[in-house]
Design a protein with these regions (language model features):
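Bacterial N-terminal signal peptides
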Residues: 11-20
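N-terminal secretory signal peptides that target proteins for export/translocation
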Residues: 1-4
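Active-site microenvironments in enzyme catalytic cores
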Residues: 29-60, 69-72, 78-271, 280-281, ...
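Conserved glycine-rich phosphate/nucleotide-binding loop
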Residues: 344-392
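N-terminal export leaders
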Residues: 6-9
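Boundary at the C-terminal end of the N-terminal hydrophobic targeting segment
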Residues: 22-27
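Structural motif
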Residues: 177, 312-314, 320, 368, ...
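A conserved acidic, glycine/proline-rich C-terminal tail/linker
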Residues: 38-39, 282-364
Length: 392
């Protein structure tokens, strides 16, 4: 039986949810998301947080303690050289040092050197399975007509701060900027969460709204079904250049600003303080449901986590603000979906709608440039490209 109007409207709207000189930003972000002003990056105050970066030199990955930023480079200490550990996971190196030792190193600055921005690699975790929150900002929930935040899995390798994403024919590629988090240990309980070092980084959550339209569970939107298929893939999860470990994670998150620019025009601007579910709540719900809940993905069902724990190879995507491309379908489409006699008839309506949206070219197109940025977490630059030709 086709869903009723209220359910269908929510179904259509929720698709959108899942969606460098130092100048500190003190004011709350403006609601004028179409402005062109850019939130410039600054280093998180060293008395409240440590900022880490990584570079690859040959086969070795070096983990750095960042001391200063400029237009062309960062100034940092090589913690890998100091510890003798060259790990792809920054936390392996960071955990060789106490907070007090890091403070002393930052104060002394002995051995600090410059590293060019283009040499910085992504600081995301090395796994594929991540935890994502949908409609976790009130303004975004308002624009898509969904009051409650919900969770779903995202299956993607973490990319770096300079990436590409393919926008093929018929795809509706949308952008979302998010605050991401990862941990220095496996999280099996809230006690583990409270004790863990928490690292924050800016990330992108690209999605194909066409896939989401086809896969969405219209009867139960907050099940999250349809989101893993639409948001997973090799180029859907770019990560920023900085992993920031604060002493007070709640205060730090409350000061974060995130935004998206497309071809220089600001599309999204949000204050992380406005999240509905904070990081601890997301962890709690993930652990509580780990043994019982599954989500649809590639015509099967998958859990959020494979074991009853959040591993060090997983990240948490905490949601996005308003300003994504997707908008509620037009009245005729909604009526047609409501009147469809069965799922096959609904699919016909959905495919017609997807073709119409693709023809408008309002979603990301080849040659577009997307910039995700944050005041303390750095920036990600993504170039949208066409799929390779078959004759190449």
């Amino acid at each position: 039986m086709p869903p009723n109007r209220r359910t269908l409207s929510a179904a259509c709207l929720v698709l959108a949810s899942m969606t460098l000189p130092a100048v500190t930003i003190h004011a709350a972000p403006s609601t004028n998301t179409r402005a062109t002003a850019v939130t410039v990056a600054t280093l998180a105050p060293l008395d409240r947080a440590h900022t880490f970066a990584q570079v690859r030199e040959g086969d070795a990955v070096r983990t750095l303690l960042v001391l200063a930023l400029s237009d062309k480079n960062i100034t940092a200490l090589d913690l890998s050289a100091l510890s003798g550990l060259y790990s792809t996971d920054a936390f392996d190196v960071i955990n060789r040092f106490s907070t007090a030792q890091l403070n002393d190193l930052a104060s002394a600055k002995r051995g600090a050197r410059a590293y060019a921005w283009p040499d910085l690699i992504g600081v995301g975790p090395r796994g594929l399975a991540h935890i994502a929150a949908g409609t976790n900002y009130p303004a975004h929930g308002d624009e898509v007509g969904v009051a409650d935040a919900f969770l779903f899995p995202k299956i993607s390798p973490a990319g770096g701060p300079r990436t590409t994403i393919v926008a093929g024919p018929g795809a509706l590629i949308d952008y979302e900027v998010e605050v991401c988090a990862r941990f220095d240990r496996e999280i099996r309980s809230l006690h583990d969460f409270d004790e863990a070092r928490k690292g924050f980084f800016v990330c992108g959550d690209f999605s194909d709204r066409a896939t989401m339209m086809r896969k969405l569970n219209l009867k139960e939107i907050t099940s999250g079904d349809g989101f893993p298929d639409a948001k997973s893939g090799p180029d859907r999860f770019p990560s920023g250049p900085f992993l920031v470990v604060p002493t007070d994670w709640k205060r730090f998150v409350s000061e974060l600003v995130i935004e998206t620019h497309v071809n220089g025009e600001r599309r999204q601007l949000a204050a992380a303080a406005h999240m509905i579910k904070d990081l601890r709540t997301i962890v709690q719900e993930t652990l509580e449901d780990a043994a019982t809940r599954t989500w649809s993905y590639q015509d099967g069902r998958i859990p959020m986590v494979r074991r009853l724990a959040i591993g060090t190879d997983s990240a948490i995507l905490t949601g996005t603000g308003d300003g994504v491309v997707f908008q509620e379908p037009d009245t005729d489409t909604v009526k047609a979906l409501m009147g469809a006699k069965d799922r096959a008839a609904q699919i016909v309506v959905i495919e017609r709608y997807i073709a119409s949206e693709a023809a408008k070219r309002t979603y990301l197109q080849p040659a577009d440039r997307v910039r995700y940025s944050s005041n303390y977490l750095g920036a990600i630059d993504t170039r949208v490209i066409a799929p390779p030709r078959n004759d190449q």
